[in-house]
């Protein structure tokens, strides 16, 4: 990658904009592509993304654009921050242009029809590209406001990890590397579901003990499912697992937490999502995750409980009561209980 070659960021949302700013602050020329030409022009003129990151100045090194073809042709390193529902339709027509390029997914979601993660879709579209993911406890606004933050870039291609570290690592943003792409990405996608439960618990005035129980049992569920799919359980003790889960389940800045909080205040799911005005991937993930967990026979009572709340008319109190009445099991999976016999 030559010094002046631009890095592409696909997506005009909050996280894509925050990452574009980080790149530009490190002296990297950035082309941020978005589907809406009016949004691109407004950001170019006003140097702000008022819908998704109001009050954050867009760095002069970020060029908002609407020409996807030109953006892909000009860049060898491409960060993909598109909604899970749109990623395939946006990039599949341009598959030939992606050959040999570095594609890094920023999207924490799962494709509904196939239960594929975003990097798996990228791999299908561009099998000869180098694929990676970026995930961790990364609230977009805090990144944009230069709060001290760490993240994980994961790929089977060590050179891609090093390339991402070189362009993103900075004074307030630390980038760690991992070879467990599947585990890192799955952690980022699964925790969105549990953030909805956490937001509901806070809105309903539940105690700190209850919230702590929900978060730790969520981690156990996430890990149990991920290991059944081939992920490394140790990945879930890092930034992309427990780190991301804690911040998403604890912060009112989290979109999925906000949806849960609105539900806890008595709003319908439709009202909560409409009020948010952005994609809350957890709602989409919940539907496909419940089905997949049943197919592979992985015990996920919180997922089943949240599905019952959102789509079957149950309340959070009923779900927690059911959880408390369930048969007690071991605290931490993957630790032998032979000593109990």
UniProtKB/Swiss-Prot annotation:
It is an enzyme of class 1 (oxidoreductase). Its main location: cytoplasm. Sn-glycerol 3-phosphate binds at residues 108, 136, 191, 244, 254-256. Disulfide bonds: none annotated. It is found in: Cytoplasm. NADPH binds at residues 14-15, 35, 108, 140, 255, 279, 281. Its EC number is 1.1.1.94. Pathway: Membrane lipid metabolism; glycerophospholipid metabolism. Keywords: Cytoplasm, Lipid biosynthesis, Lipid metabolism, NAD, NADP, Nucleotide-binding, Oxidoreductase, Phospholipid biosynthesis, Phospholipid metabolism. One of its GO terms (biological process) is carbohydrate metabolic process. One of its GO terms (cellular component) is cytosol. It catalyses: sn-glycerol 3-phosphate + NAD(+) = dihydroxyacetone phosphate + NADH + H(+); sn-glycerol 3-phosphate + NADP(+) = dihydroxyacetone phosphate + NADPH + H(+). Pfam families: NAD_Gly3P_dh_C (PF07479), NAD_Gly3P_dh_N (PF01210). Belongs to the NAD-dependent glycerol-3-phosphate dehydrogenase family. Catalyzes the reduction of the glycolytic intermediate dihydroxyacetone phosphate (DHAP) to sn-glycerol 3-phosphate (G3P), the key precursor for phospholipid synthesis. This is Glycerol-3-phosphate dehydrogenase [NAD(P)+]. The lineage of its organism: Bacteria, Pseudomonadati, Pseudomonadota, Gammaproteobacteria, Pseudomonadales.
């Amino acid at each position: 990658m030559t010094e002046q070659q631009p890095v592409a960021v696909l997506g005009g949302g909050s996280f894509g904009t925050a990452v574009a700013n980080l790149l530009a602050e490190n002296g990297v020329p950035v082309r941020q592509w978005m589907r809406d030409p009016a949004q691109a022009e407004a950001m170019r003129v006003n140097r702000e993304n008022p819908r998704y990151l109001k009050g954050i100045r867009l760095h002069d090194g970020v060029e908002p654009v609407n020409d996807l073809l030109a953006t892909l042709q000009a860049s060898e390193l491409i960060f993909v921050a598109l909604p899970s529902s749109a990623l395939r339709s946006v990039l599949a027509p341009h598959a030939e242009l992606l050959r040999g390029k570095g594609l890094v997914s920023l999207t924490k979601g799962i494709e509904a029809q196939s239960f594929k993660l975003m990097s798996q879709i990228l791999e299908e579209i561009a099998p000869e590209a180098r694929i990676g993911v970026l995930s961790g406890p990364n609230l977009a606004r805090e990144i944009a406001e230069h709060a001290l933050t760490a993240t994980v870039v994961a790929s089977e291609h060590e050179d891609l990890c090093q390339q991402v570290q070189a362009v993103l690592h900075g004074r307030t943003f630390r980038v760690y590397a991992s070879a467990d792409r599947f585990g890192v990405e799955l952690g980022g996608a699964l925790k969105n579901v549990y953030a909805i439960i956490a937001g509901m618990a806070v809105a309903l005035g539940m105690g700190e003990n209850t919230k702590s129980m929900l978060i730790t049992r969520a981690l156990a569920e996430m890990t149990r499912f991920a290991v059944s799919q081939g992920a490394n359980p140790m990945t879930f003790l890092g930034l992309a697992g427990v780190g991301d889960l804690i911040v998403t389940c604890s912060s009112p800045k989290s979109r999925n937490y906000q949806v849960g909080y609105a539900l806890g205040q008595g709003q319908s799911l439709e009202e909560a999502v409409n009020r948010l005005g952005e994609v809350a991937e957890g709602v989409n993930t919940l539907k496909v995750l419940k089905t997949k967990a049943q197919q592979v026979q992985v015990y996920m009572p919180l997922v089943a409980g949240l599905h019952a709340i959102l789509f079957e008319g149950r309340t959070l109190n009923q779900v927690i009561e059911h959880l408390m009445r369930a048969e007690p099991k071991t605290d931490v999976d993957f630790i032998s209980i032979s000593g109990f016999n």
